[in-house]
Amino acid sequence: MTEPSRTLVPESIHRDECVSLLGAAALARVVISVKCLPVALPARIALIEGNFVLLASSDPAVILAAERGDVVSLQIDGLDADGLTWSVMASGIAKRATGQSPPNEIMRQAFDRGATFVLLPLSVVVGQRG
């Protein structure tokens, strides 16, 4: 006799844990609209004061979105020790960061290579595990 298949039901991740996962991440997908189509682009990230994410990107579309004050989302995902996957998405109105010094070595390297910093407030933060 075969075992019945186990169906995983995704569970929501509390905002505080989502922010913690964002704080531990160094890389994310920045999700923007380019000519009315969704685009996901890689960017280095750093959590600032638990309320903002600083993105480092050299992509002109990301920089333009920040200069226009577009709604931008970022997404990270991972795998727990027990094999469950998780995903966190944060969204807010982006703005180009001026006068922001690189908060860590990874961001400093991006800045030295010509990346522009974009500040994203954590207006909406959602996550799920499953």
Language-model features, listed with the residues they occupy:
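A short, compositionally biased
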Residues: 23-27, 68-69
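Short beta-strand segments
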Residues: 25-58, 74
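Extreme N-terminal tail/first-helix region
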Residues: 1-22
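Short, structured patches in soluble enzyme cores that scaffold and shape functional sites
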Residues: 34, 76-78, 121-124
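Charged phosphate-binding loop/patch that engages nucleotide di/tri-phosphates or the phosphate backbone
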Residues: 116-130
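Structural motif
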Residues: 51-52, 71, 93, 124
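Short, structured beta-strand-loop surface elements
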Residues: 58-116
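Secondary-structure transition/turn motif
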Residues: 56-61, 122-124
